[in-house]
Amino acid sequence: EAGVMLPTMSNILAKKGLQGGEWTVGIPGTVGGSICMNAGSKQLSLANNLLSVRVIDTKTLKISEIEKKDINFQYRFSPFQQNNLMIISAKLLFEPKGNIEQLLETTQKNLKKKTDTQPYHLPSFGSVFKNPTNNYAGKLIEELGLKGFKIGGAEISTMHGNFIVNNSSANSKDILDLITVIQQKVLQKKGIFLEPEVRMIGFDYP
């Protein structure tokens, strides 16, 4: 189902001896959201395991199934970001007959790696910006000394520059304003425009 949280899916897969989903344990999102945004970690994404998705057309309410070969996935992009189709479930293929003990251990190691380097203890929506070609958004932000910079209750994480956390009572405007400031500063100092991974809904955003 599209609403299953990725960490929940990761643990279920490991307990059933299914390999290939261990990396999803630290991703703060759902199966449907991950496919829609083509979210991932390094070179990994659920698109690699996808067979098909069931979608509902939000205009006609027609439900249909789309095979992976008919979906044009790109870096942090899928056509579902631009059409009227909402993902309601997906068929995914993982390798069977894995060693359950080893899979659980790998899953826990991956989670520890995330919690050691990312603000897993605070509310966030994961990485804010796409990585520019041959560079890293977090590295650019950190080089400008922006970690810890705040607008309202929204703060650039002190652990990782490409995360915005709700450190108190952040609202959506605080977060959008902080995203805009980051983009302006990185463009001014580095000559690079950081493109958001996240989608803006209800805002006049270019």
Language model features with spans:
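Short Pro/Gly-enriched beta-strand edge/turn motifs at strand-loop
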Residues: 34-37, 73
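Short glycine/proline-enriched turns and hinge-like loops at secondary-structure junctions
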Residues: 46-48
